[in-house]
Amino acid sequence: MDHGLEIATLGGGCFWCLEAVFQQVDGVRAVESGYTGGHVSHPTYRQVCEGDTDHAEVVRLTFDPATITFREILEIFFSIHDPTQLNRQGNDVGTQYRSIIFTHSEAQRAVAEYVIGELVANKVYDAPIVTQVEPEQPYWRAEMSHQNYYQEHPAQGYCAFVISPKLAKFRRDYSHRMRR
């Protein structure tokens, strides 16, 4: 990894949704879909979807904190998924879709807890936030068919009806954070 870059690992529903948004964020150098938080080494998509591994679908971001801070990444993260839904996002149901932040340092943990505290204090959501904050765990890259999914399949039904609206919301609310 390049000197000065940091890693963020986030789960908030299907990793295709998060991947598509964060690929457009200025300062995010790389986005990779994968699995973490479970007890099986090298899990497959099928195993994770069957719910037998306890893994979450996540994106692992490599970002330049001089361009975008971890806090700003979390602000985008909380705007593109519903952190009040336990083990689901919309019609995607299961523990693999849980809202979770895997932190890579004590500083990230503190920022994550602070941002969640602000959201609660400001009553941004009507229901309790269920986002978990946990230290990083072994991470496994998802299969190639899950990398760059939206870019490869923009007309696919899930992409058109679930991911495209999230991208539109991101572009509307965070145009200043988009890559130029």
Annotate the PLM regions.
Residues 1-180:
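Flexible coil/turn and secondary-structure edge motifs
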